[in-house]
Amino acid sequence: MINFNQAAENNKKPILTELKRILVEPGALLEIGSGSGQHVLYMAELLQDVIWQPTEMAVNLSALAHNLTSSRIHNILQPFELEVGKDWPNGEYRYAYAANVLHIMSEKLLPSIFKELKEVVQAGGIAVFYGPFKYNGYFTTDSNKRFDEWLRKKSSEAGIRDIEMVLAEAHNSGFTLIEDIAMPANNQLLVFSRQ
């Protein structure tokens, strides 16, 4: 597998446990930033009523497509290029899912991701974000603080986001937080409903 990611391997089971409970209706799901495809390959097989649309930035798209080629899982569509802050292809999805995306992309793009989701997630649909967050300006653990420092050394645009800022941008685009679930390794699963 090209671009294998150990963190994705470690978190796929606990995330799936929650998604089985959240994604109860059949429908299409837009995965933002599919990375190596480890999540879609694992989860689509076990959530057969959900049609998965993997996406990735242009620079990573060929690796994702390569990893998905050998898959015979019927509910995974061909991946396409998607970048927050640029035009998204038309589509209508019941669900959207992004794991470890918000702390990698620029904070300036937070308004864009929710505005773009509003255009593609149907009313009453669900958007799910997995990753670490700060609460009231504070890291939840020392390890998250160290992780944030490491991220910012790699890119000045990256960093763990304040939950309050995420919630405000979500609200501005018609998304309401319905669950904030504590996950292993100091991460959260944020579940939003689109009005």
Describe the predicted segments one by one.
Residues M105-L117:
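A short, conserved alpha-helix within the catalytic core of class I
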Residues G124-F133:
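Conserved beta-strand signature within the Rossmann-like core of class I S-adenosyl-L-methionine
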Residues L30, Q38-K86:
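Class I SAM-dependent methyltransferase SAM/SAH-binding core
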Residues G35:
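Conserved glycine-rich SAM-binding loop
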